Amino acid sequence: MTSDPVFTFCIVSDGHVNPEEDVSSSPWNSNRMANGRNRYVVHMLNQLKPDFVIHLGDLIHPVPSLPSYATAARLFHEIFKPLNCPLHLLPGNHDIGDKPSSWTPAEIVNDPFMRQFETHFGSTYSSFDFDDCHFVLLNSQLLNSGLQAEKDQAAWLAGDLEQNRNKRIFMFCHYPPFITSPDEPEHYDNLSEPGRSWLMELIDRYRVKALFSGHVHNYFYNRSNDTDFFVLPSITFFRHDYSELFKVGPAEEFGRNDLGRFGIFWVKIYKTHHAVHCMRTEGSTIKANTGEPLPEIQTHGFHPREISWSGLGIDMRYPWAEIIEMPYSGGLDEFYRKKARNDHPLCAMWEMGVKKLRLPIHDLLDPQVRDRVSALKQMGHTFYLFMYDIPSSRMIDILKQHADLIESLEIIIPWKSPETFLKPLKAIRDTVNLPIFLSKLQSSADAEKEGGRFKHFIKHGFQPSETGVIREYLSLKGATEAIDGFVFRIGRLSDPLTEIHRLSKEMTTLGKKTQFLVTLAKENPALCEEDDHTIADRVAEASTVAFSLPDTSIFIDTFIDMDRGYFPRHGLVDRRSNPRRAAHVYRQLNTILGPHSENLNIEGIETVGSGKCISLKSPGFAWILILPETEMDLSRLEIQALNDHLDSSPGTLFNLVSGERSGVQLDGSSQGPLAAEKKHHEFIIADPSLLCFVL
């Protein structure tokens, strides 16, 4: 179970409020929607009920030299007036001018611009305490300006940090010090020298817990020494030059109105750590003075830092720490190919609460990726490596040096002469001090031929039918001492629920552990699996069995869509890391079943229409997961496992895609809008002793 946070706060950035409704000085329609999107964010903040909110700047869109600045400022205050908690404001470059540079596209920061901001919004830098934490709001545009205000802020900051050095310190500014590396060259989206190094030295000296910045309208996470560095997305529009990070065509407005890129941060402060949730807004808007019903905000989910259970892991097929050079665009950067990393897959993983990541060993060999592994380890992730054949001496050295980053090593071998690998496997196990799991190579060269047909494939993992092969292997002298367990591949023709439990139990009787790779691809490499309902069912089964076997590592393949090449299929998220149906199901099951995973048992499976029903129990709770293959009328749902609960009090119906909840009686009658309708969605029915999942 997780503990409650001591307090929470939210962070908003780059709202770009216009001086008029549905009118903007920018040529893009997304900018004209800014005011409505800001209103939606205020409504969202009120539902999250943070203790306070910090805005990182670009409060308004008109730059300081425009006569519409004051009008936009008044409208900003009008939009944020309904906010039910304190609001702390920082200036962005649209509010007081660009950072000091001879090439920036707008006027740079100066004293008149700052006085104008102070008139409408207050001080450009400040600090405050909350509980045992200290919050520092920095005017980043002042750095390198040469203004007297820069000297004043520097003296104030040095004294403020020293006075509060025994507190947990969090820092906030508009410009990020960097977006990829502390030593990266200057560009439009970072701080220049010497101000950057000055700030980084202070951050290191006072062991700042996290620094949050905006400006880039994109999501980035980095870690330098003991500090987390976050860059926030905008609530209004995406900086479409960063569409280059995605290896698919741009979204609407050539990427600027990419709805999955908008969001706010909801930060939970615990006694010993913090967890940062990126809450998507999807570009939602609320019109002024319409009186229309306001939508309910769904807040269910855990960050990996918040949970003790692991759940279902994911196989990381795509490069996930790759640094990409982006073309100079002519809009903001014209002299340098800016480098950036696509952190949106990471954002999606944290949104789902994924902890376990399966990586090829070559990720650990790359210093850049290895640093990323180390950073994410601090965020609660665990890493499981795999490789083909016996590792080289260089690989063994790396494994020994960084064994603290790794949970286990899977070694895949050809099965023609497995006895020849016994001594090398034993030597590796003794040397690297890691659990070693053995996996079998499966390829088209060894497969049975279908008449005159031949299809190329390379797979790995023992098939569920090959336990006899394993028993024969373990009968070899020295085999038991050479490895800790075996890896099974659960292909599309195998049932994850029954096979994983059966194989885990059988291997336990042999004194060996198991790992499983559950695939989503079809068996034919030319056919695409794009049935999101079928995929969600499979992810639901794999998640459920993972919670019931907390000491067994189970991974799902695939995380991100494979939309080209062999075995094309949908994953949990699309190529822009927007969640598909399966990602929502994963997140909801992780939230509801995860806290009970230490004592969760699968009690039975029954047929329901053309689908199945899985009964689960833990002390004080019972669950029923229903996986129909077609639409079903929930008001006529007949499940044998419900018979013991027909006299129970009304439960709650959960939609595992939207997170929506409503009351429901166990005989199928509903107190809300969902149960009596035909649905092809994911649901849960719950009371204090019963939860029923309906997919």
What are these regions (language model features)?
Residues 1-67:
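N-terminal active-site segment of His-dependent metallophosphoesterases
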Residues 28, 64-164, 168, 189-210, ...:
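Extended active-site neighborhood of metal-dependent phosphoesterases/phosphodiesterases
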Residues 41-54, 336-365, 375, 379-386, ...:
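Catalytic domains of carbohydrate-active enzymes, especially glycoside hydrolases
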Residues 182, 240, 245, 438-456, ...:
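Active-site clefts of carbohydrate-active enzymes
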Residues 265-266, 273-278, 300-302, 540-631:
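Aromatic- and carboxylate-lined catalytic core of secreted/periplasmic carbohydrate-active enzymes
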Residues 475-561, 643-646:
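Catalytic-core region of carbohydrate-active enzymes that cleave or remodel glycosidic bonds
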Residues 604-660, 688, 692:
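Carbohydrate-binding surface patches
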Residues 665-695:
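C-terminal beta-strand-rich structural cap/linker in extracellular carbohydrate-active enzymes
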